[in-house]
Amino acid sequence: MGKLLRKPLNERIAPGVTLVQDINQGNSPLSYVGFRLIELEEDAVYQETLDGLECCIVALTGKISVSEGDHVFSEIGTRANVFEKIPTDSVFISGGRAFQVKADAEKARVALCYSPADRNLPTTLIKASDNSIEQRGKYQNKRLVHNILPDVSEVASSLLVVEVYTDGGNFSSYPPHKHDHDNLPAESLLEESYYHEINPKQGFIFQRVYTDDRALDETMAVEHQNAVIVPEGYHPVGVPDGYDSYYLNVMAGPKRVWEFHNDPDHEWILERD
C-alpha cells in the first residue's frame, strides 16, 4: 500500500521555489489524484506543462499571478494565513497546457491539485466569492467548509477540491465515511488526499484510515504541513483541544460525483437530536 502519511519534503526545485509536498502516481497508490504544495519567495516563478492532467491552482496564502496562454490572472489570493478562515482564489487549467505561477508578495504558498483531464475545458478563475460556504455538523462534530470545486461545478472534468476547518475538540470527516466503490447512486469511487495545517503550528491532529475488514487500518499523528493519502476506506480526523485544523482535500475517480457511505457502526451519531 505504501506510506499514507507524508512529511514535508522542503526541496528547492527552482530559484525561490520550494517543493513541500509531492504526491503522484509514481510515488503513491493513487491512480486519479495528484497533489503538490509549493512555497514561492517574492518574484519567484514556478512553471509546469500538464500532460493528460487538469490542475486547480489554489492560492493558499499570499498574492500570486497565474498565466496560461493568453490568460493572465494577477494579484489573486485573499489571505496571509489560512486560519483567517475566509475563502481564497483559485485557477483551473485543463490538460495539455503550460502555465506559470509567480509570487507577487514576499512569500506565497500554493496548492496544485491534479486529476485526469477527461475533457478539454476553458482556463477559469475561481474567485473567492465563487466558493460556497457550509457549516456542517453539531456537538463535537462541527466544521467549516469552503467548496472550491464541488461536484455541482462544471468548471472541471474530474477534479474535486474543498477546504475544511475544524476547531479544537471536534472531529471531521465524521462519522467515518468512505467513497471507494463505484456503486452509484449509493456510493462513488473517489480517491482522496489531505493536506494539513495546524494552528498553532506545533500542534498535531489524528487521522485514521481503515477498511471494513481492517486489511487497511492505519492511525497517524499528523503534524503541520503533513499530507495523508486515502486510496480507500474510512478516514476520520480528530483535533485535540487548544489547536485548530485546516485541510485541503483533493478527490477524483472514474465519475465526478461525491456520494459517500458512512461506517454503519457509527452512523447512529447522526440520529441524535
Swiss-Prot record:
One of its GO terms (biological process) is inositol catabolic process. SUPFAM superfamilies: RmlC-like cupins. It is an enzyme of class 5 (isomerase). Disulfide bonds: none annotated. Its EC number is 5.3.1.30. GO terms for molecular function: 5-deoxy-D-glucuronate isomerase activity; glucuronate isomerase activity. Keywords: Isomerase. Belongs to the isomerase IolB family. Involved in the isomerization of 5-deoxy-glucuronate (5DG) to 5-dehydro-2-deoxy-D-gluconate (DKG or 2-deoxy-5-keto-D-gluconate). This is 5-deoxy-glucuronate isomerase. It comes from Listeria monocytogenes serovar 1/2a (strain ATCC BAA-679 / EGD-e). The gene is iolB.
